Curated annotation (Swiss-Prot):
Organism for this UniProt entry: Agrobacterium fabrum (strain C58 / ATCC 33970) (Agrobacterium tumefaciens (strain C58))
Residues at which ATP binds: G77, P78, E79, S80, S81, G82, K83, T84
Known role: Can catalyze the hydrolysis of ATP in the presence of single-stranded DNA, the ATP-dependent uptake of single-stranded DNA by duplex DNA, and the ATP-dependent hybridization of homologous single-stranded DNAs. It interacts with LexA causing its activation and leading to its autocatalytic cleavage.
Annotated compartments: Cytoplasm
Similarity remark: Belongs to the RecA family.
Biological process according to GO: DNA recombination; DNA repair; SOS response
HAMAP family referenced in this protein's UniProt entry, alphabetically: RecA
Keyword Transmembrane helix in record: no
Protein name as it appears in the record: Protein RecA
PROSITE patterns: RECA_1, RECA_2, RECA_3
Length: 363
């Protein structure tokens, strides 16, 4: 009796594998080769290509060395917090690797002089200033489907005004129109973004919800669809000023990885954004270097490999700016210890310390 039942189980497993093979071949005949496969059989599917954000500490906090290609990214925060700066720095990094980038300027507020200062190559940057939200998203869809664009930035979701609102009267109430537009666009975009390996960055603004008694009253514009479709969400805030004597020369900025489908979320980093320069790379090297024990700090003096960098943080930054070889050595050492730095030294903001709706948004 036992032998009969054993044979029956074996027959079932053979039947299952045959049925699976038949189903797979039928799917491939109907939808083309590669429409279904075993995930481990193609190494290119498993490994995710990334583009640096221009901030070493943020690259480490993201867990994969930058922002993932073929995914949707959302960067949100208050006014003048550095959202567009971070997006432009990502474009500059992609262009350094030979990538083609596009900027959909729905706010009609891009400053080309500032973009050039951040390292953006304006000659090869594609720019569009659409009149309506539908036009902006149609342009985005066409560029993504072309398969030729590596990074596309939409600035911003709040400025994607539906055509019905523009053609209507001032004061007309059109509830949920923008949210429906975003939901439909993301449904269409998500598959072509993945296939074309194009990273689409949505910059978003924040609004206040009325009557919230518990939790954060902040929310982002454009409904909830973007929160679900985004693989990475970054909350960027200005937390202070960088001063030289009495003059303010930059912002102290905190970025929290609110959602991350590629690595553990809720990592939090702080860095300086200098006016007319962007993210202070040398400042990050000094701060992260000290935390990781690569740069030694004795009193006010900073040193690396027994070589003095300077007295005080600003002097150490100046030394690294003037000596790029030393700066590159420190950066290489930090990138080699990225996992250790992320686990030990980057603050974990926790799920509650972000935007109101987002407690459970870890991939």
């Amino acid at each position: 009796m036992a032998q009969n039942s054993l044979r029956l189980v074996e027959d079932k497993s053979v039947d299952k594998s045959k049925a699976l093979e038949a189903a797979l071949s039928q799917i491939e005949r109907s939808f083309g080769k590669g429409s279904i496969m075993k995930l481990g059989s193609n190494e290119n599917v498993v490994e995710v290509e990334t583009v640096s954000t221009g901030s070493l500490s943020l690259d480490i906090a993201l867990g994969i060395g930058g922002l993932p290609k073929g995914r949707i990214i959302e960067i949100y925060g208050p006014e003048s917090s550095g959202k567009t700066t971070l997006a432009l720095q990502t474009i500059a990094e992609a262009q350094k690797k030979g990538g083609i980038c596009a900027f959909v300027d729905a706010e009609h507020a891009l400053d080309p002089v500032y973009a050039r200062k951040l390292g953006v190559d304006l000659q090869s940057l594609l720019i569009s200033q659409p009149d309506t939200g539908e036009q902006a998203l149609e342009i985005t869809d066409t560029l993504v489907r072309s398969g030729a664009v590596d990074v596309l930035v939409i600035d911003s979701v709040a400025a994607l005004t539906p055509r019905a609102e523009i053609e209507g009267e001032m004061g007309d109430s059109l509830p949920g129109l923008q949210a429906r537009l975003m939901s439909q666009a993301l449904r269409k975009l998500t598959a072509s973004i993945s296939k074309s390996k194009c990273m689409v960055i949505f910059i978003n603004q924040i609004r206040m919800k009325i009557g919230v008694m518990f939790g954060s009253p902040e929310t982002t514009t454009g409904g909830n669809a973007l929160k679900f479709y985004a693989s990475v969400r970054l909350d960027i805030r200005r937390i202070g000023a960088v001063k030289e004597r009495e003059e303010v020369v930059g912002n102290q900025t905190r970025v929290k990885v609110v959602k991350n489908k590629m690595a553990p979320p809720f990592k939090q980093v702080e860095f300086d954004i200098m006016y007319g320069e962007g993210v202070s790379k040398t400042g990050e090297l000094v701060d992260l270097g000290v935390k990781a024990g690569i740069v030694e700090k004795s009193g006010a003096w900073f040193s690396y490999n027994s070589q003095r960098l300077g007295q005080g943080r600003e002097n150490a930054k100046t030394f690294l700016r003037d000596n790029p070889d030393t700066a590159n050595e420190i950066e290489l050492a930090l990138r080699q210890n990225a996992g250790l730095i992320a686990d030990r030294f980057l603050q974990n903001g926790g799920p509650d310390a972000g935007e109101g709706d987002d407690g459970s948004d870890e991939g």
